[in-house]
Regions:
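Active-site donor-nucleotide binding/catalytic segment of nucleotide-sugar enzymes
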Residues: 1
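Glycine-rich phosphate-binding loops that contact phosphosugars or nucleotide phosphates
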Residues: 4-143
Length: 145
């Protein structure tokens, strides 16, 4: 939702394209569940705003996928619901959360919690964490090549 949705789109682009300009590699499959405005608005209208991420997740999620949930409050109901769906499919979940981690904390396999009340600081840390983790992923890929 909001800035976290923008962060999700930003980070998924890093997986599909690349993080560092000096590295050429195959694209890594990634999608932001917040990127398709037609699906989001249709789902919000026809079902409920709390289900906007569930419908695409249910259609796209496969065994061995990883779901990264990004929310500054940790309490976004639409994120909580998709995390519950991921758990029922035995999909690994990583939470980029803020504050105390909120309701999402108990549905994530790995919690990266920024203990702040400042939305801006939380979002800045989420992007840093996303870049740092992905840099490690790229390094692992390069070692295997």
């Amino acid at each position: 939702n909001g800035g976290s949705a923008a962060d999700a789109q930003h980070l998924s682009a890093e997986y599909l394209v690349r993080l560092r300009p000096n590295i050429n590699r195959k694209p890594i499959p990634a999608i932001s569940l917040a990127q398709d405005t037609s699906t989001l608005t249709a789902c919000g209208n026809d079902y409920d705003f709390s289900d906007i991420f569930r419908r695409p997740f249910q259609a796209l999620a496969k065994k061995n996928d990883v779901l990264i949930a990004i929310t500054t409050s940790g309490n976004s109901l639409n994120v909580v619901k998709v995390l519950k769906d991921a758990r029922s499919k035995k999909i690994t979940t990583i939470g980029f959360l803020g504050g105390s981690g909120g309701k999402c904390k108990k549905f994530c396999d790995i919690n990266l919690i920024v203990p702040s009340k400042s939305t801006a600081r939380i979002q800045e840390c989420h992007i840093f964490l996303g870049h740092f983790i992905f840099e490690q992923v790229e390094n692992l890929i390069l070692k295997k090549q």
